[in-house]
Amino acid sequence: MKSDKILDCTGLYCPEPIFRTRMAIDELESGQVLEVSADDPAAEEDLKRLAARLGHEVLEVKKDGDEVTLLIRKH
């Protein structure tokens, strides 16, 4: 799936990926997709919870070694 915005949070640790993801989502229009990459061990669960709390949809989660990439659709 194509993303409308890409956010690279590799090398950043909690809570920085959450703050940056929240700001990036706020910049999107409803229906647009954000691609977030991170290597913080807590990032996958933290970003899933953030999306759920804000009412957005996690479309896909991809793991490659220590890095996780999530596609989040803004509602």
Which ranges hold each PLM region?
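Core SAM-dependent methyltransferase catalytic element
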Residues: 69-75
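Short amphipathic
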Residues: 3-10, 35
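Amphipathic, hydrophobic secondary-structure cores in small proteins
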Residues: 15-59
